[in-house]
Amino acid sequence: MSNRILLVEDDQSFGAVLKDYLTINNFEVTLATDGEQGLKEFTENEFDICIFDVMMPKKDGFSLAEDVKRIDKNTPIIFLTARNMREDILKGYQLGADDYITKPFDTELLLYKIKAILQRSAVLEDDEQEQFKISNIFFDSM
C-alpha cells in the first residue's frame, strides 16, 4: 500500500480542490463528504493516512477518529478544520491525531506534514516487521 489518503470533508468544493491538489502530488485520494461515509470507506478499503474535518453532518471528525482508532490504532490521522479553540486541538491530539491543522492553511505545509507522517509510519512498520522476524528466528531456534 502506498500513499492512499482518506479525505473526509463536508464542503464538497473545498474537498474536490484539496483532492485534486493531493492527486497532482502523487497521492491516491478517496473523498467522503460526511463521517458515516468516511467510516464506510475506511472499513471497506485500506488507507495510509486519514485527513478529517471536525464539523461534519451525521458523524463529526472526532467520533470518526475514535472509530478509526478502534479499528486500527496505527492509522495516522490529521485533523484539518476551522475549529481552532485550544480545547478542540487538545481533544484532537487526545484522540490520537498525528497533527491538527487549522483553516486557512498552507497547502505546501500540509503536503510536507503528510509526507513526514507517512515516513514515520513506514519506519515504525519496518521496525515491527524486523521485530517479528527476530521473534520468529528466536522461537524457531528453540
Q: Where are the regions that the model predicts?
A:
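Acidic, metal-coordinating helix/loop segments flanking the phosphotransfer/catalytic sites
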Residues: 6, 31-49
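Short amphipathic alpha-helix used as the core "switch/output" element in two-component signaling
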Residues: 40, 62-73
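The feature encodes the CheY-like receiver
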Residues: 57, 85, 103
